[in-house]
């Protein structure tokens, strides 16, 4: 598989994709995504990330229901009006977030450089930062391969994370950073313009 794209083009094209074709993401493509992810910077060289591919049909259906459940819980907590909640549920009926591949991105909290309770928070942040950079690498590689992705944060609700770990037979030392939907976009992705410019978010000293 030889596909090349300018990095600036991949960055510009990356956007959250929520609707996918039924076409499978094969194992070769999956491995290309993970290879890109693990080239990310990693604090203390620990590489304490771990990826779970929820890929079989039955497993994907269970994950999809967890995503739906998480969104209902999230928007209920935000006080979403009933009419808007109905629209959200209609989008799920239309297949929103139903993907041929879900990637769980975890960190292993037991893999660390600094020992001792006083460093727990710092080491946790280091691991999160490493995983976040790996996720961006993965997403940009996905653009190059003609795939779409979306970061699903609601799966980090404790009861949903627990179920995702149970499905993957992972112990308490693992922490879910996020779930990524992966697939071929149903429609041509249309990246949105950012509300803030580089000048708005930059301070030069």
Predicted segment positions?
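Short acidic N-proximal helix/loop "leader" segments that mark the beginning
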Residues: 2-24, 28-32
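C-terminal helix-cap and adjacent tail motif
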Residues: 9-10, 15-17, 175-205
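Short Asp/Glu-rich motifs
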Residues: 29, 56, 63, 161-163
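Glycine-rich phosphate/pyrophosphate-binding beta-alpha loops
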Residues: 41-45
């Amino acid at each position: 598989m030889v596909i090349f794209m300018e990095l600036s083009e991949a960055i510009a094209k990356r956007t959250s994709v929520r609707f996918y074709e039924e076409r499978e993401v094969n194992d070769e493509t999956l491995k290309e995504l993970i290879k890109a992810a693990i080239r990310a910077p990693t604090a203390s060289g620990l590489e304490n990330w771990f990826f779970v591919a929820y890929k079989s049909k039955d497993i994907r259906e269970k994950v999809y229901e967890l995503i739906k459940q998480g969104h209902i819980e999230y928007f209920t907590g935000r006080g979403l009006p009933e009419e808007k909640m109905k629209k959200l549920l209609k989008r799920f009926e239309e297949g929103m977030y139903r993907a041929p591949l879900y990637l769980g991105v975890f960190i292993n909290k037991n893999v660390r450089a600094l020992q001792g309770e006083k460093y727990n928070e710092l080491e946790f942040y280091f691991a999160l930062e490493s995983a976040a950079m790996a996720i961006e690498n993965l997403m940009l590689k996905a653009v190059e391969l003609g795939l779409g992705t979306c970061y699903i944060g609601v799966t980090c609700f404790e009861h949903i994370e627990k179920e995702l770990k149970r499905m993957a037979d992972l112990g308490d030392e693992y922490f879910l950073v996020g779930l990524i939907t992966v697939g071929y976009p149903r429609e041509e992705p249309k990246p949105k313009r950012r509300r803030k410019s580089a000048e708005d978010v930059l301070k030069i000293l």
